[in-house]
A protein has these predicted regions:
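Bacterial N-terminal signal peptides
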Residues: 6-16
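N-terminal secretory signal peptides that target proteins for export/translocation
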Residues: 1-2
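Gram-negative/organellar outer-membrane beta-barrel architecture
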Residues: 24-29, 35-204, 370-371, 377-392
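C-terminal outer-membrane beta-barrel translocator/porin domains of Gram-negative envelope proteins
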Residues: 195-205, 209-334, 386
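Residues that define the transmembrane beta-barrel architecture of outer-membrane proteins
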Residues: 25-27, 39-43, 74-78, 102-106, ...
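Small/polar (Gly/Ser/Thr/Ala-rich) solvent-exposed segments
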Residues: 336-344
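Short loop/turn motifs that connect adjacent beta-strands in outer-membrane beta-barrel proteins
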Residues: 21-26, 53-61, 87-91, 115-121, ...
Length: 392
């Protein structure tokens, strides 16, 4: 879930858990603020309607959250959000959004990640987006901040994954995807257009492809990212065929993350990420990248792009104190972190390693809501990320 909306939904759930049995439907008018490096600050208001479950008032059945916001580049944006929680590990959500300047979005997901052994799982994604905040610095690990350019990206993707639980922790699956991308010549004020600064960048003419692959997941974290302890790993590989703008493309990805309880006030967390892309005439937006609120904080989104990428990261999550208001339990924390990583293509994967350091100011609302303000430095200025959820 992106910044702004996510952070506000955290506040909604905080308020909603205070007296869940008072009414089946509760209303919360909330202010809205988000900031990420590529987009700047966004301000607005979001009325939220939360409906409690029919059989258990302590559980949320649905959340409806329309909003109106303003950003200096996108103008006024109207957004409709609906989240439906069907049962444990099964939900769907729909987002519709339009701005007075360029931006449009349709986003639907359905997730059935039940943990029952020998049961089928299903994940569906349909997304269409036009957004003016994309940046491009060129290819390779040695691009400099001064090489920044701007473009608008129009893309559509539809994907599905069907899995089978070998055990409650181990799932194997197959997935398929159809996607199309079209970079457009709409640059942010003060930045050169990517089409002018990088006229030979692969993929500027647009591309479409279909692909299919295999995926294996192992996860002992009973509450996902919010578990006190556990280990998760995922391996995937797919092969795609270009419809237009690209030949063939292969993508291989591996991730691993671990959560370790050290003391009552301290939790350790670490992650490893790797992606390798192979193929002919692969567009830059289909290659491996680092930078953003999840991978390599300290750099803006997609700061480095190439055919391969890796990153390692570790956090120490310190609980400063705990509050109890209206039956809501919240941990207030400061979580310092360090990271190292690199994109690579023609160069060796260890030839131009970069690092970043930072700290997260976080509020964890039991059992599974976290709002964070992460501050990170990687040699190109201090970056701030106001978002919901752990980076891993």
């Amino acid at each position: 879930m992106r910044a702004g909306a996510g952070g506000l939904l955290a506040a909604v759930c905080l308020a909603a858990t205070a007296h869940p049995a008072v009414a089946k439907t509760r209303f919360f008018p909330l202010p809205m603020y988000t900031t990420v490096p590529n987009e700047g600050s966004t301000y607005g208001a979001m009325p939220v309607f939360m409906v409690a479950s029919d059989d258990d008032p302590d559980k949320v059945k649905s959340i409806t959250a329309p909003s109106v916001s303003w950003n200096s580049s996108a103008g006024v944006t109207g957004t409709f959000r609906y989240y439906r929680y069907l049962e444990m590990f099964r939900s769907w959500h729909l987002l519709l959004s339009a701005s007075t300047t360029i931006n449009r979005s349709v986003w639907f997901t359905y997730d059935d990640d039940r943990r029952t052994p020998r049961a089928l799982t299903l994940n569906i994604l349909v997304r269409m987006r036009r957004n003016l905040f994309y940046r491009y610095w060129g290819l390779g690990p040695n691009t400099v901040p001064e090489s920044e350019s701007s473009y608008t990206r129009l893309f559509a993707v539809a994907s599905a994954r069907v899995g089978w639980n070998v055990t409650s922790d181990f799932n194997v699956g197959v997935y398929g995807e159809v996607r199309g991308d079209s970079p457009e010549r709409h640059a942010l004020e003060g930045l050169p257009a990517t089409q002018d600064l990088y006229p030979d960048a692969p993929g500027l003419g647009g591309a479409a492809l279909v692909r299919a692959g295999l995926n294996v997941r192992y996860d002992t974290r009973l509450q996902g990212d919010y578990s006190p302890a556990g280990f998760a790993a995922e391996l995937s590989g797919d092969v795609g065929h270009g419809i237009t703008g690209v030949g063939w493309i292969g993508q291989f990805t591996g991730t691993a993350r671990v959560l370790v309880p050290e003391f009552s006030f301290l939790q350790g967390a670490a992650r490893f990420y790797w992606m390798q892309v192979v193929g002919n005439d692969v567009p830059f937006y289909d290659r491996a990248s680092l930078g953003g609120e999840v991978l390599f904080r300290g750099f803006p989104e997609n700061r480095f792009i190439d055919m391969g990428a890796w990153q390692v990261e570790a956090e120490q999550r310190f609980k400063l104190f705990q509050t109890h208001f209206f039956g809501v339990v919240a941990d207030w924390r400061i979580d310092p972190f360090v990271a190292a990583g690199q994109v690579y293509g023609q160069t060796a994967p260890w030839e131009h390693v970069r690092g970043s350091v930072g700290a997260g100011l976080r509020m964890f609302i039991h059992p599974d809501i976290l709002g964070r303000i992460d501050l990170a430095y990687a040699g190109e200025g201090l970056r701030a990320y106001v978002v919901l959820g752990y980076p891993y």
